[in-house]
Amino acid sequence: MVRFKHRYLLCELVSEDARCRLSLDDRVLGGLVRDTIARVHGAFGAAACSVGFAVRYLNAYTGVVLLRCRKDFYQLVWSALPFITYLENKGHRYPCFFNTLHVGGTIRTCQKFLIQYNRRQLLILLQNCTDEGEREAIKKSVSRSCLLDREPVEELSDSAGEEVAEAME
């Protein structure tokens, strides 16, 4: 049995209009990339990339997109991304472009890179703060979001511990 090797392109959709990112849909985005590949590389590029191509992850709030394609043809996808200059969805046309952040062999390596990238962006954001009030607001927001992520896990472990204690009695 042969394993198909893939490449994952971690991209960021950059647009000045916030409505562009919020109106994202993985099917629309996948179709846009496929159409661009066909326009740039012709029938060969469209056929070569259509076999293993998929949008694996899409975050509409941050504009982060993870594209999967076959290892042999990832350069065709990568070279077609700069030719995407707009996103058309529901009759609206939004100017945008793709910024390729990372090319990896697994989803896990892309996740690790994205965590490091977000940490660097947060550090830059904190360094560019003009006063202490902005810096404290950002720190409070980040710590609040971290606490919200951890609370459900603690609640689950507490309730599981109580169930184990009841079962032992």
UniProtKB/Swiss-Prot annotation:
Gene3D superfamilies: Ribonuclease P, Pop5 subunit (3.30.70.3250). The keyword RNA-binding does not apply. Pfam families: RNase_P_Rpp14. GO terms for biological process: rRNA processing; tRNA 5'-leader removal; tRNA processing. Component of ribonuclease P, a protein complex that generates mature tRNA molecules by cleaving their 5'-ends. Also a component of the MRP ribonuclease complex, which cleaves pre-rRNA sequences. Belongs to the eukaryotic/archaeal RNase P protein component 2 family. This is Ribonuclease P/MRP protein subunit POP5. It comes from Mus musculus.
